[in-house]
């Protein structure tokens, strides 16, 4: 499953911002527009027992260039909220449901 980070028209958003995957399925977050983005999972909005540091990028790490990717697999069923640290204040976030 591919999630674009930034819209072709300059939108600061994850596209899609809601998705469903199977446990263990690969999710590829791809910088689409060349703004600096990252993927941080919200420690208060993931299934109990999930260590967000093992699935999130570091807040200091950024995908700067178009085409750069971050790949993650989520093994525990449930709902995970994620966001882009630099653009969280303007609502760049999303939800993935693992079935």
From Swiss-Prot:
Regarding the membrane, this protein is recorded as: Peripheral membrane protein
The species this protein belongs to is Ginkgo biloba (Ginkgo)
Name used for this protein in its record? Plastocyanin
NCBIfam families documented for this protein: cyanin_plasto (TIGR02656)
Task: State the UniProt keywords alphabetically.
Answer: Chloroplast, Copper, Electron transport, Membrane, Metal-binding, Plastid, Thylakoid, Transport
Question: Can you provide one Gene Ontology molecular function annotated for this UniProt record?
Answer: copper ion binding
The entry assigns this protein to a family as follows: Belongs to the plastocyanin family.
Q: What is its main location?
A: plastid
Q: Which GO terms describe its cellular component?
A: chloroplast thylakoid lumen; chloroplast thylakoid membrane
Q: Where in the cell is it found?
A: Plastid, Chloroplast thylakoid membrane
The Plastocyanin-like domain sits at 1-99
- Gene that encodes it: PETE
The protein's matches in PROSITE patterns, at most eight in alphabetical order, are given as: COPPER_BLUE (PS00196)
Fetch the InterPro entries from UniProt: BlueCu_1, BlueCu_1_BS, Copper_blue_Plastocyanin, Cupredoxin, Plastocyanin
Cofactor(s) named in the record? Cu(2+)
């Amino acid at each position: 499953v591919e999630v674009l980070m930034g819209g072709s028209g300059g939108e600061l958003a994850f596209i899609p911002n809601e998705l469903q995957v199977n446990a263990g399925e690969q999710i590829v977050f791809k910088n689409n527009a060349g703004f600096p983005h990252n993927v941080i999972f919200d420690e208060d909005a993931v299934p109990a027992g999930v260590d967000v540091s093992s699935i999130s990028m570091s807040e200091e790490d950024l995908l700067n260039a178009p085409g750069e990717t971050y790949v993650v697999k989520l093994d525990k069923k449930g709902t995970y909220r994620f966001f882009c640290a630099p653009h969280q204040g303007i609502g760049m976030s999303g939800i993935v449901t693992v079935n």
